[in-house]
Structure formats: C-alpha cells, structure tokens
C-alpha cells in the first residue's frame, strides 16, 4: 500500500527541484548593475556624498562614546561604595568569607559548657 504513495511524492519532488533550478538559473539582479564609480559624480554630488559620510561617521562615534560612558559610569558607581548599607554588605561578605578561617585557627576544637563557666554538677548529690 505504501508503494502507491511513493510515485506521486517522487513526481512532486522532481517538479519542485526543477522549479528551484529555474529560479537559480536566473538570479535576481541588484539595484546597481555595475560597480559604483565615483568619477562619474559631479562636484555637488561628491560634496553631498562626503557630507553624508562624515555625518554617519560622527553619529557612529557619538553612539560609541555614549555607550562607553554608560559602561564606565556603572563601573565607577560599583567601585565607590560610601553608603552605610553598602559598607554593611561589604563587611558582612568579608566576615562570611573569613569566618571559616577564624573558626579553624582561633577557637578550640572541643568547646563545651565548661569552657565558658557553665553550670557545674556537684558529685555529692
């Protein structure tokens, strides 16, 4: 039964490939058929073209400088941390990073209630 479905598919695929080959044989042409030759421009057109190129260049440089200022401003803002909240967060981060070192180096390993004068048990009761 599947054999009867195969030939129409084969014919359809050959037709599609043939049409694709026809479109490929005649490619679309661009707006400019030849290369751009600046020698064919008169003086006014060349001045207008130069002004447009300079304007585009200035706009590109302005966008780049604005982008650089935005990223530079955010870096400066992150480095300058003078508010109380920011300093508290920095101190908390520093303490959490150094806490494991303090615990391992300065505190005794066997800490119990007797070290800090905890409740004593009398043996005579």
Swiss-Prot record:
Keyword Membrane among record annotations: no
Name of protein: Calcitonin receptor-stimulating peptide 1
Highest taxon of the lineage: Eukaryota
Propeptide: 26-77
Family the entry assigns: Belongs to the calcitonin family.
Pfam families: Calc_CGRP_IAPP
One CC-aspect GO term: extracellular space
Gene3D superfamilies assigned to the protein according to its UniProt record, in alphabetical order: 6.10.250.2190
GO BP: adenylate cyclase-activating G protein-coupled receptor signaling pathway; regulation of cytosolic calcium ion concentration
Organism of this sequence: Bos taurus
Gene coding for it: CRSP1
Signal peptide annotation: 1-25
Gene Ontology MF, one: calcitonin receptor binding
InterPro entries: Calcitonin-like, Calcitonin/adrenomedullin, Calcitonin_CS, Calcitonin_gene-rel_peptide, Calcitonin_peptide-like
Protein purpose: Stimulates cAMP production in porcine kidney cell line LLC-PK1 via the calcitonin receptor (CT) but not via the CT-like (CL) receptor.
PROSITE patterns linked: CALCITONIN
UniProt-annotated location(s): Secreted
Keywords of this entry: Cleavage on pair of basic residues, Disulfide bond, Receptor, Secreted, Signal
S-S bridge residues: 81-86
């Amino acid at each position: 039964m599947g054999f009867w479905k195969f030939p129409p598919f084969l014919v359809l695929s050959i037709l599609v490939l043939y049409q694709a080959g026809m479109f490929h044989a005649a490619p679309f042409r661009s707006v400019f058929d030849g290369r751009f030759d600046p020698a064919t421009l008169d003086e006014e057109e060349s001045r207008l073209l130069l002004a447009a190129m300079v304007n585009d260049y200035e706009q590109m440089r302005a966008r780049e400088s604005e982008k650089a200022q935005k990223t530079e401003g955010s870096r400066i803002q992150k480095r300058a941390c003078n508010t109380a909240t920011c300093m508290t967060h920095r101190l908390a981060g520093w303490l959490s990073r150094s806490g494991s070192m303090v615990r391992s180096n300065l505190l005794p390993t066997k800490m119990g209630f007797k070290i800090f004068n905890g409740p004593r048990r009398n043996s005579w009761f």
